[in-house]
Structures are given as C-alpha cells and as structure tokens.
C-alpha cells in the first residue's frame, strides 16, 4: 500500500480523503495484477505509479476547476487521466474512449471493481467519434 500521501497535499483544487486513498490503492493493485495480460504500462513501481500516473493525471486541475462536468478521455489506455479524475471528482460524467479492445475490457473491469458510476466506455478510434458528438467537448 502507498504511504507517501503528502505528495497530494500541495494542491489547492482537490483534496484527498480515505475513500480516495482506498480507491487509488485498489486501482494500483488491479493495474499491476492485469498489466501483463493487457500491456497497460511499463511503469509498475508503486511510488512511480502514484507520482507519474495518478498525480500527473491531476495536474491540469490546478488550472481548471472541476465540479460536475462531462469529460471525455480519448485514448485513455489504462485510464489515465480519466479514472483518476473520476475518483477525485465522483460527480463528473466520464466517457473513456479506447480503440484497443483488450484495454477497453480492462477499463470495464476496473470501473466495476472501483464501483464508479456515470462512466461510459467506448471501444472506438477517435476518427469514429463523429456519431458520438454529444460526448465531445
């Protein structure tokens, strides 16, 4: 389990609580468990995942306030930044767009295990999104 939670404390537009910590820990466990099957990331060391994937997913939040927007994450791969944003901001409506079928299946599994609501996963390429205009911001 991750213990260096202080890295999340230097930011003004989000806070971290025990529920978020639990979900991030579970996300990491699932990511590592499923990584070999789905080829999700080459970064697998605990502290690196939390700093380079989870914390980096929140960097633009310092410039843009997030409350309950609709957010589309195109080419989300292992769910960065979309899933991390959803964990920190559960009121957003999130659409994850991933062309790789195996990674899209991983995302479905991850969303279920993390018990995230209002998440739609589209197994599509960006060029195919014209029919999904309502998802684009």
From Swiss-Prot:
S-adenosyl-L-methionine binds at residues 75, 80, 126-127. One of its GO terms (cellular component) is cytosol. It is found in: Cytoplasm. Specifically methylates the N7 position of a guanine in 16S rRNA. PANTHER family: S-ADENOSYL-L-METHIONINE-DEPENDENT METHYLTRANSFERASES SUPERFAMILY PROTEIN (PTHR31760:SF0). Belongs to the methyltransferase superfamily. RNA methyltransferase RsmG family. This is Ribosomal RNA small subunit methyltransferase G. It comes from Mycoplasma mycoides subsp. mycoides SC (strain CCUG 32753 / NCTC 10114 / PG1). The lineage of its organism: Bacteria, Bacillati, Mycoplasmatota, Mollicutes, Mycoplasmataceae.
